[in-house]
Structure formats: structure tokens, C-alpha cells
A protein has these predicted regions:
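DNA-recognition alpha helix
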Residues: 47-62
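Polybasic low-complexity intrinsically disordered regions
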Residues: 24-35, 39-42, 48, 76, ...
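Alpha-helical architecture
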Residues: 65, 102, 174, 241-242
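Basic, amphipathic alpha-helical segments enriched in Lys/Arg and hydrophobic/aromatic residues
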Residues: 232-294
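Helix-centered, glycine/charged polyanion-binding patches within enzymatic domains
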Residues: 182-252
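Major-groove recognition helix of helix-turn-helix-like DNA-binding domains
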Residues: 61-79
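Basic, short loop/linker segments at the boundary and entry of helix-turn-helix/winged-helix-like folds
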Residues: 1-43
Length: 294
């Protein structure tokens, strides 16, 4: 199964490499650096493991493998990040995003005794934890419509606003009660989206401060009188789609589970998460092809 996913990843890397420039002083192409990084992530191993030829299948191994120091330096360059983004677009397909999108965050917790200088304390899974957080907007594609990796202390509302600003299009954005803020409703509407989330304090009034008219609309959608209009509740029932997206992202071999000991510092976490998203996109594409041929 790993080799089937690798075939998808390798084809996408080759397609991007065909039009991707190369610095004249580079010994190894960016495509080779990306292949080594993805091979390590596919098998949940460190980069140094993937730098040894014995750990590759002969049919998958590049002609030459970089050493660990080269990988450490090259994976922090902008061209490496740009290459990964283009591979993500290739695996994500050309389907237009849906009118209904869902936003949420997934904590990436570290042990409490971690010495990672970038990790911060914040709200984890039902407790205060230290680590990072993966923020994402999904609409059913193989890749998220937008995502970001931050420290755990970063505000989910602020990150939602940043991702909405990059989305484009229009429609409904479903979220949980943690995103209930009038300024965020106005910001989403300015970018073409109606934020739909329950009140942080249900069953109470709206207070005497400024209340966004778009927040009032969401309240009317989710709290219809006597259940006469079920459009809002039926629409919001789709918010569980992101829970399935997050669960499917971790429920297979090679998925985004806990961060391994060698993934510390923010740039390594971002590269690791991106690799796992690409691997998951390859898995989704294979599953959809199998479903169509069945």
C-alpha cells in the first residue's frame, strides 16, 4: 500500500519538477530533496533514515541521495516550501471548492517536559498542553482549501480569519462555538462567507455591546422558532465532516499522528504536516479511483 501511495506522490513530484527551476549551485534538485523528505514521512522515519540507500526500494531510489546536513539546510529554503505547495495543488485536483466549508483546529501535543523552544502552552485536547496546532478549512477535497501550522497558543479565531482571507469564492463557513465573535462574522462576510456557528453561551441574550448582523443571522439559522425552518440545523449538521477529515488523516499507516521525537521546531513541524497532507491526498485519490472502478 505504501508503494501505491508513493507512485501517486512520485508522479506529482515529477510533474512539478518538469517546470520547476533549479539554482545553478545546487548539487541536488529540489525534487530530490522533496522525494527524500516524503519517503521519510511515508514510513514515519527520520530524514537521516531516508538518506541511506539501503532503506529505499531500488525502483524508488533517486540516482543520488543527499546527506543529512544538506537535507536540514535545503528543507528550510523557500523553494522547498514552494515545491511542496505545487505538489499539493497537483494532488488536490482541479475540482472547484464547495459552497459549504468547515474550519477547525487539531492540537499537535508534545510531552510536558519538551525543550522545544518554539512550542507554547495552550488549549489542547480537553486540557492545557504544550505543542503546536494544525488549523484547516476543508470542503471535501483531497487537500485542505487552506491550512496553517502555528504554536498551540495561537488564537483559532485569528487563524480562521487569516485562512478565510486566502480562500476566495463564497459560501457558508461552518465552525464550532469557539469561533463565536462578531468581528469574525463581519470579516468572513467581507470575504464572501457567512460564518455559521452556535453561540458560545447558548440560551442567553446578545448583551449591550456591538453584535454583528451576520452573527444574528447565524443565531436565527441555528435557533429557528419551534423548528419551523430546518435549513440551518441541516446545514450545520455537515460540520462533522471536518471531524471525519481529521480522523481519516490519522487513521492509516503513515498518517498524521503524534509528532515523532525528531520533529521539533516550527519549520520541521510545518514540513512534517505538509508531507502527511500530501500522503493523505495520495491515499484519498487511490480510494476514489478504486470506488469508481468498483
Amino acid at each position: 500500500m505504501e508503494l501505491e501511495r508513493w507512485a501517486q506522490l512520485s508522479a506529482a513530484v515529477s510533474a512539478v519538477a518538469a517546470d520547476f527551476g533549479r539554482h545553478p549551485r545546487d548539487t541536488y534538485s529540489t525534487a530530490t530533496i522533496v522525494r527524500v523528505h516524503l519517503w521519510a514521512a511515508l514510513f514515519d522515519r527520520s530524514t537521516s533514515w531516508a538518506c541511506r540507500a539501503v532503506n529505499w526500494k531500488p525502483c524508488t531510489r533517486p540516482a543520488e541521495l543527499p546527506d543529512q546536513s544538506t537535507m536540514s539546510r535545503r528543507t528550510r529554503r523557500d523553494d522547498f516550501e514552494l515545491f511542496l505547495e505545487q505538489v499539493g495543488k497537483r494532488l488536490g485536483g482541479k475540482a472547484a471548492p464547495g459552497l459549504v466549508r468547515v474550519v477547525d483546529g487539531k492540537p499537535l501535543e508534545l510531552p510536558n517536559h519538551t525543550t522545544d523552544r518554539d512550542a507554547t502552552w495552550g488549549r489542547g485536547v480537553s486540557r492545557t498542553s504544550v505543542g503546536y496546532k494544525f488549523h484547516a478549512v476543508f470542503s471535501g477535497g483531497a487537500m485542505p482549501d487552506a491550512f496553517a501550522v502555528t504554536t498551540l497558543a495561537a488564537s483559532e479565531k485569528d487563524m480562521a480569519a487569516r485562512m478565510v482571507g486566502r480562500l476566495g469564492g463564497h459560501g457558508y463557513l461552518l465552525a464550532d462555538a469557539h469561533f463565536d465573535a462578531s468581528w469574525l462574522f463581519d470579516y468572513c462576510r467581507h470575504h464572501g462567507f457567512q460564518l455559521v456557528c452556535p453561540r458560545a453561551k447558548p440560551g442567553t441574550g446578545t448583551g449591550h455591546h456591538y453584535v454583528s448582523p451576520h452573527r444574528l443571522r447565524a443565531i436565527r439559522m441555528l435557533e429557528p422558532p419551534a423548528g419551523v425552518n430546518t435549513f440551518g440545523p441541516d446545514l450545520y449538521a455537515r460540520r462533522t465532516d471536518i471531524e471525519r477529515q481529521f480522523s481519516q488523516l490519522v487513521c492509516f499507516g503513515g498518517g498524521l499522528t503524534t509528532l515523532p521525537p525528531w520533529v521539533r521546531r516550527i519549520w520541521r513541524v510545518r514540513n512534517w504536516v505538509m508531507a502527511k497532507l500530501l500522503i493523505n491526498a495520495a491515499r484519498v485519490r487511490l480510494n476514489r479511483k478504486a470506488a469508481l472502478s468498483a
